[in-house]
From Swiss-Prot:
Entry-linked Gene3D superfamilies: Dehydroquinase, class II (3.40.50.9100)
Stated family: Belongs to the type-II 3-dehydroquinase family.
UniProt entry keywords in alphabetical sequence: Amino-acid biosynthesis, Aromatic amino acid biosynthesis, Lyase
Annotated gene: aroQ
Subunit structure, interactors included: Homododecamer.
This protein's name: 3-dehydroquinate dehydratase
InterPro entries in UniProt: DHquinase_II, DHquinase_II_sf
Active site as annotated: Y22, H100
GO molecular function: 3-dehydroquinate dehydratase activity
CDD domains noted in UniProt: DHQase_II
Amino acid sequence: MKIMVINGPNLNMVGVREKGIYGAKSFEDICEYIKEEGKKRGHEITLFQSNCEGEIIDELQKAYFENYDGIIINPGAYTHYSYAIHDAIKGINIDTVEVHLSNVHAREDFRKKSVTAPACIGQMCGFGEDGYILAIKALELKKMSK
């Protein structure tokens, strides 16, 4: 499968910021892990990170025009209020899994609501970098069920 992995604001700072919540692995190490695991499973993985909402939307639309089979998105804080990203996910009709490194449901109240998850086929949270691999497996299972 051709899978796009999109990471939103501040995820480039993982390994630097709030290590007790997000872990000590660098963003670069997590990206390498995702690529390696995807390759082992026979997938073509494209990674993208931006701190800008419009760039994330552009990348989602690019996934449509470049015929991606699945998307994994960690919208970061946009999770809680970006109806524009929600609409972009809905508009492209590509199976998408939302991922969060931490368990957002065990944190502050404002983090418990996701406006982007309803546009996705599911959500993985609280599994650290393994959440991305679980999302790959979810996309595989979804494809097999079609």
